[in-house]
Amino acid sequence: MRLLPKMGGVISIWLTSTLLAMKYLTPLNLAIALLSLLSVNPLMYMKKDFSLVFPILLSALAAYILYLNPTTIYFLLAYSILFIALKFVNEWRIETKIGAFALTFPFPMMALAYGAGLMEILAPLTLLFSLTAFNLFLADSRIYGRVSAKNYLAIIPLALIFYILSHPVLAAAVTAAAIVVTVKANSISVRSFGFSLLFLNLLFVVGFLALDFAGLL
């Protein structure tokens, strides 16, 4: 069984979530990030082989983080539902979406392991979720149909969430990039489209980290 999720561009969501937690980076948190990525396929297929060691180790680390930071319980309950759903959903398009949200796991867990509080996590996690939802909606339209007016309308809630929860400069940059990616989506290859979404994710995380480092968030 392949170790990495066969879900196309959703690994970029994992990368974004991991990079978003860079200021919390420790050996423990690096292990959390890697085990999160390596646990998706074993949980989906539940084959009785060595790969099950990854979700077992991830569960052990999650329990340890819960011991360190009781706030962890809220996130564990939410993400447990996502990881369990991977086992029971057989529709590929739905499976991909669930997998993408499950792979946002590193950021909150790395922050919690470092001792971050609930309010410190909620705003960036909401931004990450909103961008993930936008990307998934746009990708679904691009791959299985055509990008249409509904995809342009989806930019509105994305922009509002970013303007409310982040710095105006970051909100403007992400909104502008989202518009460009949406406009170009139908006219470029699927591969180029995937790189465009990766660029959008990296623009968000680099901008967020830079503004956070500068004390502007």
UniProtKB/Swiss-Prot annotation:
Disulphide-bridged cysteine pairs: none
Keyword tags: Cell membrane, Membrane, Transmembrane, Transmembrane helix
Cellular localisation: Cell membrane
Membrane topology: Multi-pass membrane protein
Keyword RNA-binding: no
Superkingdom to which the source organism belongs: Archaea
One GO CC term, this protein: plasma membrane
Spans traversing the lipid bilayer: 13-35, 50-68, 75-94, 109-131, 152-174, 194-216
Keyword Transmembrane: yes
Protein name, per record: Uncharacterized protein AF_0172
Organism expressing this protein natively: Archaeoglobus fulgidus (strain ATCC 49558 / DSM 4304 / JCM 9628 / NBRC 100126 / VC-16)
